[in-house]
């Protein structure tokens, strides 16, 4: 066993100090160290060791992956629990370290508390670091676990924090604060990931941005209660930590029983947030479960018809969808039980004879005959009190003892920790997927878990509910391996890496107003690559903001995601449908690039504009987007980041998003480079001198294509590889 373990991948090194008998500590997480000898690793640890001064313990105090007060750590403890008030402080002694090419398994024991601990630490080939722990009780009686959090250290140069907040229709809104002494705690008690989750908690050097600064990010991969923390203390320690937020009495370990934490993911960016984000994207794209076939163009019926289900109307909508190039048609809420509005029917997962007297077969036949897949909306974790299921099994609703929580959206939470309720839902979904040709489920979750306990026992049940949902998704995917599933939760209320281990797409927000979607999708993509982010073209007037937006802006925003349409196309003009078909065709042309290339964001000084691009080996697409008026008239230049500095690129506007729609163009003032001929510049010139921004009206987008030029002078096509 090595005293110091060095893991390295994709430009990242992690050095773990396993000397002594206490829990190991990370002494380096950052840029790759290259080939280093064991002597150099020892000197690295020596160089990082502090002087032993302070008052919590004689000798130097270090922060381990699981910090303990018994080691002199007076910050947030990694473990909290007890045996009837005893064994409340842990003191683990390391019993073994097992190493592999990309990971370490640390084993430890607290003999007095009779607890065994196993910590997995892995450095993925993408450079993403992840860790989790398993705690096992080895004594008779019950060990009541309060929390088990793991920590990753960050250096003293991290002086700023970035995390996220939000609400329905505005998820993942960024907020920055100084990283000062003390503890910053972000708790999610909603029973789902939450609109306002910390999402990716980042610590970075002063002024870190998209393309500059050193930055470390941490994501707690759990879809229930979670706690994410950043702590800096007067001993010079700084760390990010996270784990599950447990409610009182949720986890009691009997002899031989274990609890496993969620995975904690860390990513490092030596050159800003794009670098950090790219590692997350590489990690997700490397998974065997990652969707590898082209992401189909989706038409969802929700904002087109809401609850007005009618075979004739939906047939016409399906025909209109097919005419613009749609490849998947999704029937949203309203097809089952008494579900004519959002006040009843949840839980009654039987096709409604009132609106579908012949079942869903006729509509599915229409959709399939038009060459599209069929998808269906479900909300398996919820129940309306006004439903046949609730009347038959009132004890299946989650509650704090005999007191039901307040309803939200006229619904309660179905207790999937109850085996009978779980089996009912699993069997009904299995039956639907078996009976009908369904390729896709939009899996919704439309309320927070409030007073979410098991009615039979009165105990808190968020932990059990979350793991039951994971098990349900796993079982259904095993039974129907070809069916894709979207994670939706009142929009973007459940976006995390653990739900994405079981789903193929996330719905970023119920707001599809492109003005709101520009920042929302930018920050969602900090963790999630574009092919997993559902992004739809809405109606000319947004249903959630009442903002009017031109079609090119709506489609240009949706292009940078998994493209779809949520608009009553039967009411659209023929000109709009023709224009939409052009955007669909462009998405189909570019989706190979968009969904495999490197996502980049410019650091734009002008707050009215943003630059988003995807760069492949020989092709790139950029969106220059204005969401406000600029204080410069005309605006200045912007860099196109991420291109090969030594290659020459043919840069020109990309139809149909090729019109610099603004006052200058309206008055006949041309932007010199913005012609079909464009300009030919090196990636170095484009990444430094850049391009002059167009004068754009607010909420307009200009697409820019950059194609590498062959030595003979011709553009290299995508078929020659990106």
Model-derived regions, located:
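Polysaccharide-binding surfaces and accessory modules of carbohydrate-active proteins
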Residues: 3-6, 12-14, 25-231, 648-666
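Carbohydrate-binding surface patches
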Residues: 11, 604-645
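Aromatic-lined carbohydrate-binding/catalytic grooves of carbohydrate-active enzymes
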Residues: 292-427, 440
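Active-site neighborhood of glycoside hydrolase catalytic domains
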Residues: 357-359, 391-393, 397-552, 562-571, ...
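C-terminal beta-sandwich/jelly-roll accessory domains of carbohydrate-active enzymes
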Residues: 416, 629-722
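Short Pro-Gly-centered flexible turn/kink motifs
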Residues: 251-269, 698-705
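Glycine-rich, aromatic-flanked loop segments that form ligand/cofactor-binding clefts
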Residues: 57-90, 207-225, 267-289, 326-333, ...
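Conserved, mostly hydrophobic/aromatic
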Residues: 11, 133, 256, 299, ...
